[in-house]
UniProtKB/Swiss-Prot annotation:
Pfam families assigned: Ribosomal_L14
Protein name: Large ribosomal subunit protein uL14
Name of the gene encoding the protein in the UniProt record: rplN
Cited SMART domains: Ribosomal_L14
GO molecular function terms noted in the UniProt entry: large ribosomal subunit rRNA binding; structural constituent of ribosome
Its job: Binds to 23S rRNA. Forms part of two intersubunit bridges in the 70S ribosome.
Protein source organism: Burkholderia vietnamiensis (strain G4 / LMG 22486) (Burkholderia cepacia (strain R1808))
Upper classification of the organism: Bacteria, Pseudomonadati, Pseudomonadota, Betaproteobacteria, Burkholderiales
Length: 122
């Protein structure tokens, strides 16, 4: 569960290392974001010579949460930390590689590109 001020690691090769959620998109009173939800983030830590710079604002999709996601069969998929993938204004991934596993819940029409780039889909 990601909320405003939550810090997430970045699971792509855009050059950002850590981002902070500044808004959960999808409704004026929406408080939490889970896996597959779009959030507005600001870059808090970036590598030198990366595609993104510290202080820039982007859309991002949450790909891993420590809270996890409950499946229809009753199983629960949890991760060690929270991670996101940065998106452009057309909601396409900015990076060309994804690091670490992602869940099957991302296999919607919007994020098939992320699923195809990921090394492992749980």
């Amino acid at each position: 569960m990601i909320q405003t001020e939550s810090r997430l690691e970045v699971a792509d090769n855009t050059g950002a290392r850590e981002v902070m959620c500044i808004k959960v998109l999808g409704g004026s009173k929406r408080r939490y974001a889970g896996i597959g939800d779009i959030i507005k983030v600001t870059v808090k830590e970036a590598t030198p010579r990366g595609r993104v710079k510290k202080g820039e604002i982007y859309n991002a999709v949450v790909v891993r949460t420590a809270k996890g996601v409950r499946r229809q069969d009753g199983s629960l998929i949890k991760f060690d930390g929270n991670a996101a993938v940065l998106l452009n204004n057309k909601l396409e991934p900015i990076g060309t590689r994804i690091f670490g596993p992602v869940t099957r819940e991302l296999r919607s029409e919007r994020f098939m590109k992320i699923v195809s780039l990921a090394p492992e889909v749980l």
